[in-house]
Amino acid sequence: MAKFTALITLQPGADRAAFARNIGDTTLAQPTLPGVFDGGDLILHRQVANEAVPSDAAIAHIDSAVYEPIGGGAHEPGLRNGVYRCLLLAVKPGTPEATVRQFESETLAMPHYIGTIRNWRLSRVTKASGARVWTHVWEQEYADIGGLLGPYMTNPYHWARVDRWFDPECPEWIVDTRLCHSFCAFERSVLNP
Amino acid sequence: MTAVQIIDDLVARPGEGKALLDAYMADYAPGARARGMVLDRVLVSPPLWMDDQPNTLTIVWNVEGAAGWWGMRLAAGADPSATAFWETAGARLVSRARRFAAAPEDVETLCNG
């Protein structure tokens, strides 16, 4: 089933919490945490392909995607009071399909090596808007922020293996350097409630 | 802290090995040093400059652990000259690879942060 995520950037001075409370029917509507990179002020997520975002003068920019999962898993279904992380990325046009599949396969192997990833899902985008024509959404859940900022970043499987797809200095580079790296707190698991 | 090696394996077009290495040292190495990379060694294989067959250059840099690696990576992302060098060098290259490695005794430390 299709999913929808929007990373919403608000005008300076807008009340993020108030905006999140009034956004209507969503699975998740949470202010982002410090440290996001082009990740917006709010993450809005729905488990259905309802891409409607209420029109509001407080909105400055939206990066969003409707997407179909191609893989995922759960080490801790029903996780509560954790951290949800979403990466929107755009594989460069013309990348051979076999290369894209290898990139997807290696990305989906990250939880095998990085234990702090408790639940995860990789998806291909069917409809994108924002700064790039996003092609993939890579979502993970962690028990706490330390799992993302610590082992996810420091494990060699990330930086010495998967990152070469993202690194313009590596000949395997296929992912546009403009990414949306966003994360927020949640009460109930988004990926495996 | 644990040493991490950044290894560039460059296969030069026949007759271009010496010029490729000179360009790497003149146009890439200064920026790499500024990004925290410490040159460990340069190897030329086979150890003569050939004009009708490819030389392979292996250039090994060190950084300090995952933090040093990310420091290098983020600095390179903000430095257009890093990717500009590779675009220019392409004319002298048959192929290249960039690998990241560590001593076997450091693997567990790197994996467990």
Name what the model sees in each region.
Chain A
Residues 1-157, 177-193:
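Short S/T/G/P-rich N-terminal loop/turn motif that feeds into the first structured element of a domain
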Residues 158-167, 171-172, 176:
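Outer-membrane beta-barrel domain signature
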